[in-house]
């Protein structure tokens, strides 16, 4: 393969929306010479945001893999979206890299997106580095941001390059490793005299030296002895500290004006771990036993599918991170999940819209393969002689659900296949064909997410849809017992129809309809019992209030009569239905609504607001407990009908830090004051008409 694993750096570029991630990626591509011109987010011309929706919205919507080759090193940069609705990109990318570069805006400072990116990196054991962008802007405040990072990210923060200005206001950048300063003209580095930044300079050098000293006992002795470190000791100590999670180096510059990018690239090479530095990757063999994979081409192939692109015109493209071995054209690889064999087409290096064929993808490298049949995101492709499975990815679960309406008649059938294609490339999108409410429902991470799905369905698949709140699947039940007769008699010439039953209807704890018989003396022959039961069950599919299915109902056949000639199965089905319809209005009918268990994970400062809102939504707070990410988990029970806009509320209230899950708990009686609205809606939907027809 072209690049040995020790000359590869796999890096996720993450942070808040607008912090400069895509511009930095674009600048690094241009700086390396891989692009003739530098694109702009504002113009929709960047390499990583090549999707039409990204260009239109001027924001990244999915993770984009951008390979950069510079001075013999290959940097596989993964530009992740900063918008919370599209954070699946971060979760995809984190599985393919050893390092995370957190981008922080020199103007906006440390925002929630940067915090979440840093936490995701730490949770997944990745090396971290910070780049403070836009440092040449007038209102940038690097040192305030530095102090804020120490508070939010912890004591590992270690500045390595700091900004300053010459007397004429020209931005310069001080390299604390070499203790030299540089200005930039057209992206080219020019050394200048070290500007005076007061007492800060010695303090920064002292702090960096102490951080390096803590990585090695010999360096600690040298530090306390007052001896300066050599350049080699600084780099090696810093590299070790980064790998062990003891140091988070902070660099800065301006991507737009090509300032200090050379120092960033150089230190991404020197300080961030290569795939070779990973001791091993843990997987499971075919028997579920643990097995270690090593980053070498001498081992059998194991490659992880971390991203999928499904385009109706270009076809399916699977992005692979090769853990061991190598991926080459014509090689058969086994999908560990399905057992199917995939034949590998020519491996590709993808740069924006450009696809370049190559000889293969070596251990530790990232590339793409087209036209895989069974593979999806999270799958492991491996040598048939050593079938291994890497841990399945964990993605945020959909929290906002909307029903789909079709603008053009006849497009209903196209929706499911089009959504299936979109779900291949978006693990946080889900599709439910709800047979009970007769609606097609899609779920995502927020309003923007579903709006993009709507746009892609139209632009990629020619299906125009609308979105509306999904209907609630209510139930009906009764509160008291009622005994009624159902008598079906019909004479039409020849054989007639006759069935006569007396049934007692009462509430019960079962979620289903329970049927029993207590007939004495053969008033209803046993061979008609199943028909009576069938009639009750058919009738109970529609309640008398709003036409919703009835639950918690026990029907006991007590008595009746029959005709030796005219009685039939159908006659007793009809008799049971008549008894049901006569009894239900007098049995205290009620409408039941679904109650969900809500688990809201929010910062401690927001717990009061969230609990107050839950109460306003007719919810009951059951308790609160800390979670593993330092948030508080509020546990509550809330009617599903009240959770429609909770996704937006929790995100706005917590500034994007909070998230939640819900799970069906049970059905409860709908408050009397809300019944008329539900009944009125049922009339509009035709529920009651259908019930009457039965």
Question: What annotation goes with each model-predicted range?
Answer:
Residues 1-694:
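Structural and coupling elements of P-loop NTPases
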């Amino acid at each position: 393969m072209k690049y040995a694993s020790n000359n590869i750096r796999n890096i996720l570029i993450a942070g808040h929306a607008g912090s400069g991630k895509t511009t930095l990626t674009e600048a690094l591509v241009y700086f390396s010479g891989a692009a003739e011109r530098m694109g702009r987010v504002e113009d929709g011309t960047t390499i990583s945001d090549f999707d039409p929706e990204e260009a239109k919205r001027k924001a990244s919507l999915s993770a984009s893999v951008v390979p950069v080759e510079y001075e013999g090193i290959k940097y596989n940069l993964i530009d992740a979206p900063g918008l919370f609705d599209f954070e699946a990109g971060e979760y995809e990318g984190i599985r393919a890299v050893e390092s995370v570069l957190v981008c922080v805006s020199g103007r906006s400072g440390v925002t929630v997106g940067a915090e979440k990116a840093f936490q995701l990196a730490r949770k997944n054991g990745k090396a971290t580095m910070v780049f403070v962008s836009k440092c040449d802007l007038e209102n940038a405040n690097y040192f305030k941001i530095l102090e804020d990072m120490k508070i939010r990210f912890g004591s590992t923060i270690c500045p390595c390059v700091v900004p300053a200005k010459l007397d004429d206001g020209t931005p310069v950048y001080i390299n604390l490793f070499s203790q030299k300063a540089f200005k930039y003209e057209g992206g080219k580095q020019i050394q200048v005299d070290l500007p005076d930044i007061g007492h800060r300079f010695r303090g920064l050098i002292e702090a960096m030296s102490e951080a390096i000293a803590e990585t090695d006992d010999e360096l600690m002795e040298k530090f306390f002895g007052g001896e300066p470190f050599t350049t080699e000791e600084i780099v090696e100590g810093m590299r070790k500290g980064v790998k062990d999670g003891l140091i988070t180096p902070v660099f800065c510059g301006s991507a737009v004006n090509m300032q200090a990018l050379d120092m960033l690239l150089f230190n991404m090479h020197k300080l961030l771990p290569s795939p070779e530095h990973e001791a091993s990757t843990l997987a499971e063999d075919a028997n579920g036993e643990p097995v270690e994979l090593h980053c070498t081409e001498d081992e059998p192939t194991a490659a992880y599918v971390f991203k999928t692109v499904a385009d109706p015109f270009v076809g399916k493209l699977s992005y692979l991170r090769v853990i061991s071995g190598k991926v080459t054209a014509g090689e058969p690889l086994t999908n560990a999940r399905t057992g199917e064999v995939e034949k590998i087409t020519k491996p590709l290096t993808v740069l924006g819209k450009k696809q370049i064929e190559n000889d293969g993808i070596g251990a530790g490298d990232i590339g793409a393969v087209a036209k895989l049949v069974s593979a999806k995101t999270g799958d492991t492709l491996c040598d048939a002689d050593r079938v291994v499975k890497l841990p399945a990815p964990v993605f945020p679960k959909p929290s906002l659900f909307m029903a789909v309406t079709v603008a053009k008649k006849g497009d209903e059938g196209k929706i499911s296949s089009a959504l299936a294609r979109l779900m291949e490339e978006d693990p946080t999108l889900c599709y439910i064909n709800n047979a009970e409410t007769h609606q097609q429902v899609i779920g995502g991470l927020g309003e923007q997410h579903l709006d993009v799905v709507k746009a892609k369905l139209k632009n990629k698949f020619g299906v125009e849809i609308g979105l509306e709140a999904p209907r609630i699947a209510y139930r009906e039940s009764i509160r008291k017992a009622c005994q009624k007769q159902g008598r079906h008699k019909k004479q039409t010439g020849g054989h007639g129809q006759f069935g006569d039953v007396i049934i007692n209807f009462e509430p019960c704890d079962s979620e289903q309809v329970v049927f029993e018989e207590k007939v004495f003396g053969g008033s209803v022959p046993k061979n008609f019992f199943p028909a009576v039961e069938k009639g009750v069950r058919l009738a109970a599919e529609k309640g008398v209030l709003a036409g919703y299915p009835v639950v918690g109902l026990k029907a006991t056949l007590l008595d009746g009569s029959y005709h030796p000639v005219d009685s039939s199965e159908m006659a007793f089905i009809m008799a049971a239905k008549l008894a049901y319809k006569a009894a239900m209005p007098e049995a205290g009918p009620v409408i039941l609504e679904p109650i969900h268990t809500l688990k809201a994970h929010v910062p401690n400062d927001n717990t009061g607001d969230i609990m107050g809102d839950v109460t306003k939504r007719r919810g009951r707070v059951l308790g609160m407990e800390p979670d593993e990410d330092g948030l508080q988990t509020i546990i509550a029970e809330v009617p599903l009908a009240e959770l429609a806009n909770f996704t937006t509320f929790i995100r706005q209230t917590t500034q994007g830090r909070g998230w939640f899950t819900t799970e069906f708990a049970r059905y409860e009686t709908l408050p009397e004051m809300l019944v008329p609205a539900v009944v009125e809606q049922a009339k509009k939907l035709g529920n009651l008409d259908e019930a009457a027809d039965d």
